[in-house]
Amino acid sequence: MQFSTTPTLEGQNIVEYCGVVTGEAILGANIFRDFFAGIRDIVGGRSGSYEKELRKAREIAFQELGEQAKALGADAVVGIDIDYETVGKDSSMLMVSVSGTAVKTRR
């Protein structure tokens, strides 16, 4: 499965648009508590554990996106948009959502 933020794939023709696909993942409140309480984890202004959790959430969202595209018979997803939103009471959770258009391609 190929993923692209652009509307086309270089060297390939889109032969069918299969539909819009999405994937989401939500990080629970504990990651924020750990993040703010665990300043000791910050090295050079970055938090390794927080970035690791975000990366994991993004991977889950992309996995869901790919599974939906595959179920539609697609071999690629184009025009992908990645969003990060705070949700829940007191914005205590972070949602990573990805969306795009599932397509069938041919070289």
UniProtKB/Swiss-Prot annotation:
Xref: Gene3D superfamilies: Hypothetical protein apc22750. Chain B
Tree of life domain: Bacteria
Secretion signal, residue range per the UniProt entry: none
Pfam families: YbjQ_1
HAMAP family: UPF0145
Family as reported in the entry's similarity comment: Belongs to the UPF0145 family.
Protein name: UPF0145 protein CKO_02237
Annotated source species: Citrobacter koseri (strain ATCC BAA-895 / CDC 4225-83 / SGSC4696)
